[in-house]
Amino acid sequence: MTTNRLVLSGTVCKTPVRKVSPSGIPHCQFVLEHRSTQQEAGFSRQTWCRMPIVVSGQQSQALTHSITVGSQLTVEGFISCHQGRNGLNKLVLHAEQIEFIDSGD
């Protein structure tokens, strides 16, 4: 099996952290908060999640400097499991495409 795609829209809720790996690859990490109403089994359901996002590579870094807390984005990429410093595993969305959502203001 090779399919691993996720598209999620939401609002950046934690300040982006920019780092460079020991191998020289720039990374930007932030958290995207999603809230929506979805249909399930014929009923409306309120959904909510916070998803850690990682953007890697030189070509993406110019875009990430425009991302701030409150930015509304649609992020597309693949998910992977990362082990945190506390030893717990968490899902992380590795962004391959990011679009800013026009707030209409």
UniProtKB/Swiss-Prot annotation:
Gene3D superfamilies registered for this protein in UniProt: Nucleic acid-binding proteins
Keyword Transmembrane annotated: no
GO molecular function terms attached to this record: single-stranded DNA binding
Domain SSB span(s) in chain numbering: 1-102
Pfam family, one: SSB_1
Biological processes annotated in GO: DNA replication, synthesis of primer
Keyword DNA-binding: yes
GO cellular component: primosome complex
Keyword vocabulary terms for this entry: DNA replication, DNA-binding, Primosome
Function of the protein: Involved in the restart of stalled replication forks, which reloads the replicative helicase on sites other than the origin of replication; the PriA-PriB pathway is the major replication restart pathway. During primosome assembly it facilitates complex formation between PriA and DnaT on DNA; stabilizes PriA on DNA. Stimulates the DNA unwinding activity of PriA helicase.
Record note on quaternary structure: Homodimer. Interacts with PriA and DnaT. Component of the replication restart primosome. Primosome assembly occurs via a 'hand-off' mechanism. PriA binds to replication forks, subsequently PriB then DnaT bind; DnaT then displaces ssDNA to generate the helicase loading substrate.
Family: Belongs to the PriB family.
HAMAP family noted in UniProt: PriB
UniProt protein name: Replication restart protein PriB
Organism from which the protein derives: Yersinia pseudotuberculosis serotype O:1b (strain IP 31758)
Gene this chain is encoded by: priB
